[in-house]
Amino acid sequence: SLLQGGSAYLPGRPEIQWKNLNPMQLMEELGQFTSVDGFKEMLDKADVGQAYMERPCLDPMDPQCPESAPNKQKRRVPNIAQELAGGCYGFSKRFMHWQEELILGGTVRDSQDRLLSAEALQTMFLLMSSRQLYEHFRDNYEIHDINWTEEKAAAILETWQRKFVELAQQSAPENSSQIIHAFSTTTLNDIMKSFSDVSVIRVAGGYLLMLAYACVTMLRWDCTKSQGAVGLAGVLLVALSVASGLGLCSLLGIS
């Protein structure tokens, strides 16, 4: 929850974040001023409870570890393998369950199939789409003078992903045995774009090498046994088929 930015403000309360948000307590306080029965019913159906406030802290000595954490009073570091066995739950225990296979890799188990350790841990951040981000801030007064568009929202998301990947890769200490691999949609698009870029020099050089190979292997001094023209025609046919394929993709708008 420390990595999930997001914050909200309420008069008379400290800044509300995932690491200090207790939905049940918040509903009780808001219930003194307005009816929140609908919200309570929704939270009950989703089995939210106290959200992350009732989950164990990685460091129970951390001052920000809530008193409601199960290992806060005992000051005991949690058994990570035991906590992650069978997967883990998100904000809603009913609708947000991450299976063990999705978050752990290289697992080691005992003879009774109990999880002992894992070599890899995967975490995921779900971002808004560019359309959702645009709609979310469209009526916000703070951006009324920047000509807010969906294209700008997409640019912000792309910049955020690039910065996140950069910071994630730099977060591991130099002498650490841990390796961090950060991947995002922007990274995938960059990879696809790099493979889609066509170098005219490389393509021409490749076909010249193919032409030379075909001529050398199929050309004979005896004209009756020479098939150099066949090799030349084959290379030209391949070149024309690739060119026609690229032209068709360009015509269809596929890049």
Curated annotation (Swiss-Prot):
The keyword Transmembrane applies. The chain crosses the membrane at residues 198-218, 228-248. PROSITE patterns: SSD. Keywords: Glycoprotein, Membrane, Receptor, Transmembrane, Transmembrane helix. GO terms for cellular component: plasma membrane. Residues 1-197, 249-255 are extracellular. Residues 219-227 are cytoplasmic. Induction: Activated by hedgehog. Residues 199-255 form the SSD domain. It is a multi-pass membrane protein. Its main location: membrane. Glycans are attached at residues 147, 175. InterPro entries: SSD. This is Protein patched homolog 2. It comes from Cynops pyrrhogaster.
